[in-house]
Amino acid sequence: MRIAGVDLPSQKKLEVALTYLYGIGKTLAKEILEACQLSPDLRVRDVNDEQSMRLRQYIEQKYLIESDLKRVESMNIKRLMDIGCYRGRRHRALLPVRGQRTRSNARTRRGAKKTVAGKKLAK
């Protein structure tokens, strides 16, 4: 089964397979299956065409997923950077945005250490 350009693994249960879509986690997958009146224990390979069409239409109408969601997220970050607010400046400087300390740690966000040469001793 294919939803929003993503192939869902056929051997997995529907509840788990839906989490392969960017923007859908376990809780949202349960809500979607409940709204579409599908069993969470149903395997992807056992879903018939009518059920898959109902599921696909419900997801595409109600939720932003995959590339649409990624585009909205990147536009939000770009807007923060354009208006020059604190969060935008932190994004631009590739530093942690949510108040984490940077004196030690923050290596993932800041990248690998840049070694600075020490003072040379005169002999």
From Swiss-Prot:
Residues 99-123 are annotated as: Disordered. It comes from the Eukaryota. Signal peptide: none annotated. The keyword Zinc does not apply. Residues 100-123 have a biased composition (Basic residues). Its main location: plastid. Keywords: Chloroplast, Plastid, Ribonucleoprotein, Ribosomal protein, RNA-binding, rRNA-binding. The keyword rRNA-binding applies. It is found in: Plastid, Chloroplast. Belongs to the universal ribosomal protein uS13 family. Located at the top of the head of the 30S subunit, it contacts several helices of the 16S rRNA. This is Small ribosomal subunit protein uS13c. It comes from Cyanidioschyzon merolae (strain NIES-3377 / 10D) (Unicellular red alga). The lineage of its organism: Eukaryota, Rhodophyta, Bangiophyceae, Cyanidiales, Cyanidiaceae. The gene is rps13.
